[in-house]
């Protein structure tokens, strides 16, 4: 279409403006805007007379064509004597009237439509005449060669052979269209927030740094869904983990000092504590779990939260990372989060030792605490195996927790065996509270009675600040107490009751 428009002689140049946040499409079905922008650049960079403009990437609001045309005029992108022409296929004739203020659009720009070989269908000509009479305009056409290609079909089949080589390479490098898209688990408001953040990051980060941040966000969401924490928090933490990375070093240092005082770490690590401050001040993040995950994404720390582990791993394992063979750690991350973080920390330690560089103290403490936790879990399993007559098994404990929840009026309580799907735990218990107050009361009751009756203390508890989804981790048993809206959205029961399709990219590790 672009080359046809240029050859037609009707235009001097072609501007291609990838949509930012199109109002007529579901956010969950959209590939994140920076991916689409950079992929378009890769596809069109060799076409003379064509330029890709980031106009809709710079505006955080929904992208309406009339507003984009106004921006082009008001910001001087086009000169006062330039004529603006909108180039589309003829299918636009049947959609134009549903757009936001079509009467403005046709006053702001002429319509030049691509016509495939052959005679225009009668219905198309009739619609064109109807629009010309309704709006007092003249619609023009230019010929193009027929191309039998559909973006929807390409995504469905995964056959990218008809795409330009730079686009195929881009898709492969960033794993853009996996069979399972983790972003469908995000709330609509999270998608809107992510686009707002992306427009700011687009101005402040390099192309490669922004793509890395997006990759980290997507992988963080995948791990969050896999290991049972909020994918919305994981998406934000993953996207913003490097938000301060390309600020001036002096500014990074001053921000880091607010968090950790003196002495400051090496310059290469400043962006993590600085990012905690910058994410709060620039992006309005007030969720302490997210801010902590940003702060510790480079080093880890002792007793890391699940979100911190996920962002730490996603930063190191996102698909564009190719500085070493990550196959084994990536495979491990699909099954056992702690063991994957241990393997990653050990790999970093070994690399530093080879360079004769000091292993960061926080990383050392993180590794030690995870190894202790792993040993404790192994010892606990061994002891349980050896003393089954003295200890109640996890199924019996799960049933006891279920009884506590039901006695406290929890709704839709379910027990899900997951030991055959992951090393994370043996069972998930999922329950619903009627309100945030009820959810907090259910959590407190489980914690209190399991301590009194079985001398069991949770390894950690997450979500008490909002009480819309509280996670109580008893190592082999993980209790999820949801607000009804959160449970309906995340559907953990359906996710874990259904076996995950085999991922051909995953290499199985030996049982040892």
Model-predicted regions and their roles:
Residues 160-189, 350-381, 508-512:
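Charged phosphate-binding loop/patch that engages nucleotide di/tri-phosphates or the phosphate backbone
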Residues 472-474:
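Active-site beta-strand termini and strand-to-loop segments that position acidic
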Residues 199-204, 212, 221-345:
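Divalent metal-dependent catalytic cores for phosphoryl transfer on phosphate-bearing substrates
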Residues 49-56, 62-78, 82-90, 247, ...:
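Helix-adjacent hinge/juxtasegments
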Residues 381-423, 436-470, 484-485, 495-512:
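Polybasic/polar functional segments that serve as interface/processing modules
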Residues 23-24, 29-30, 58-59, 417-432, ...:
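Short, charge-patterned binding micro-sites
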Residues 1-189:
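Nucleotidyltransferase catalytic core that binds NTPs
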């Amino acid at each position: 279409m672009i080359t046809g428009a240029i050859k037609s002689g009707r235009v001097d140049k072609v501007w291609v403006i990838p949509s930012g946040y199109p109002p007529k499409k579901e956010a969950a079905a959209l590939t994140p805007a920076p991916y689409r922008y950079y992929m378009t650049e890769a596809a069109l960079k060799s076409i003379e007379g064509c330029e890709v403009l980031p106009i809709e990437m710079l505006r955080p609001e929904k992208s309406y064509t009339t507003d984009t045309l106004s921006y082009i005029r008001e910001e001087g992108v086009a000169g006062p004597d330039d004529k603006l022409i909108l180039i589309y296929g003829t299918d636009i004739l049947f959609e134009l009237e549903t757009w936001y203020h079509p009467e403005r659009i046709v006053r702001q720009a002429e319509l030049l439509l691509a016509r495939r070989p052959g005679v225009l269908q009668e219905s198309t000509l009739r619609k064109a005449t109807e629009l010309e009479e309704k709006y007092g305009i003249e619609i023009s056409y230019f010929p193009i060669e027929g191309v039998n290609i559909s973006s929807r079909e390409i995504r469905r089949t995964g056959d990218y052979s008809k795409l330009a080589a730079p686009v195929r390479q881009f898709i492969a490098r960033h794993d853009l269209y996996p069979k399972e898209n983790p972003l469908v688990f995000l709330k609509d408001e999270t998608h809107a927030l992510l686009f707002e953040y992306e427009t700011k990051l687009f101005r402040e980060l390099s192309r490669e740094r922004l793509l890395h941040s997006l990759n980290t966000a997507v992988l963080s969401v995948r791990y969050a869904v896999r290991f049972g924490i909020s994918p919305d928090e994981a998406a934000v933490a993953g996207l913003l983990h490097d938000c301060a990375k390309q600020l001036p070093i002096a500014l990074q240092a001053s921000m880091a000092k607010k968090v950790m005082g003196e002495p400051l770490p090496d310059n290469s690590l400043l962006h993590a504590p600085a990012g905690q401050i910058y994410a709060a001040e620039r992006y309005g993040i007030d969720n302490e779990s997210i801010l902590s995950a940003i702060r510790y994404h480079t080093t880890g720390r002792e007793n890391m939260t699940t979100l911190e582990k996920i962002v730490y791993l996603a930063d190191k394992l996102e698909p564009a990372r190719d500085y070493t063979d990550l196959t084994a750690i990536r495979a491990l991350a699909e099954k056992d989060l702690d063991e994957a973080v241990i393997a990653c920390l050990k790999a970093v330690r070994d690399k530093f030792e080879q360079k004769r560089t000091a292993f960061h103290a926080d990383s050392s403490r993180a590794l030690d605490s995870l190894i202790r936790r792993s040993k404790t879990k192994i010892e606990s399993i061994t002891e349980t195996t050896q003393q089954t007559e003295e200890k109640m098994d996890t199924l019996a404990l799960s049933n006891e927790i279920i009884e506590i929840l039901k006695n406290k009026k929890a709704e839709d309580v379910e027990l899900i065996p997951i030991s055959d799907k992951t090393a994370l735990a043996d069972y998930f218990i999922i329950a619903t509270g009627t309100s945030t107050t009820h959810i907090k009361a259910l959590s407190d009751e489980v914690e209190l009675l399991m301590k009194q009756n079985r001398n069991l203390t949770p390894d950690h508890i997450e979500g008490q600040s909002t009480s819309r989804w509280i996670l109580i981790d008893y190592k082999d048993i993980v209790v999820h107490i949801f607000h009804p809206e959160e449970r309906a959205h995340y559907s953990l029961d359906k996710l874990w009751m259904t076996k995950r399709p085999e991922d051909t990219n995953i290499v199985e590790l030996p049982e040892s």
